[in-house]
């Protein structure tokens, strides 16, 4: 087998076009990516919101998915189950884009530090190089709109996708860090209960990104 990773539009080093970054656009991009590389079907792996996208592809294009690996996401009733203070503040904010952009310029470093400490259990991983790379990403031109799109996409997730989690029949592995401070372990166990052909794997000494903290187990 081969492993392919991609940065979605608006993420990482990918282009940040002036689009709405709607869930349907992200789904179409992923299917277009598979089409361009002539991949008829594949096993999908997604972390957090990326897990939500993998679920969306599975529900809308079931024949393109062989198996599903969901890491730390994504449940129904996101806001009710979210325990991260930093994520909650970002998702509940109704500030306009210009104000978010100004806040990112003024306080972005503090926010980055807070978010990283919530998603990572082992803080020794948060080296100066990691923090600087994260700060470089948040300073990239055009980053605000895709960040705000995550907030705006939640209603679509709750109405169009989350209610159908129990209809997924693909073999699914759900991986969860035992010290996840974004979505607690119980949230992962509930997701496991809803997806019938799923297995649940607990990762010790890991938070919201166990693939980074415990690559030996994931």
Over which residues does each language-model region extend?
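Conserved alpha/beta-hydrolase "acid-adjacent" motif
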Residues: 127, 181-187
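Flexible "cap/lid" loop of the alpha/beta hydrolase fold
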Residues: 55, 59-60, 66-101, 105
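Catalytic histidine-centered segment of alpha/beta-hydrolase-like enzymes
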Residues: 182, 206-217
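Active-site loop/oxyanion-hole signature of alpha/beta-hydrolase fold enzymes
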Residues: 4-49, 81
């Amino acid at each position: 087998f081969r492993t392919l990773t991609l940065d979605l539009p608006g993420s990482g080093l990918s282009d940040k076009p002036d689009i709405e970054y709607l869930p349907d656009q992200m789904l179409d991009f992923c299917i277009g990516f598979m089409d361009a590389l002539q991949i008829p079907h594949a096993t999908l792996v997604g972390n957090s919101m990326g897990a939500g996208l993998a679920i969306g592809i599975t529900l809308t294009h079931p024949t393109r998915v062989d198996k599903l690996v969901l890491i730390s996401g994504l449940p129904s009733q996101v806001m009710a189950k979210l325990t991260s203070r930093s994520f909650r503040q970002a998702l509940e904010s109704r500030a306009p884009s210009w104000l978010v952009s100004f806040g990112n310029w003024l306080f972005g470093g503090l926010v980055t530090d807070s978010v990283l400490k919530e998603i990572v259990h082992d803080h020794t991983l948060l080296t100066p190089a990691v923090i600087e790379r994260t700060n470089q990403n948040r300073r990239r031109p055009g980053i605000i709109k895709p960040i705000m799109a995550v907030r705006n996409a939640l209603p679509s997730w709750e109405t169009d996708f989350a209610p159908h989690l129990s209809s997924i029949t693909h073999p699914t592995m759900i991986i969860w860090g035992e010290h996840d401070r974004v979505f607690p372990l119980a949230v992962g166990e509930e997701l496991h209960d809803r997806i019938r052909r799923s297995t649940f794997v607990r990762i010790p000494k890991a938070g919201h990104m166990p693939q980074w903290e415990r690559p030996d187990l994931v």
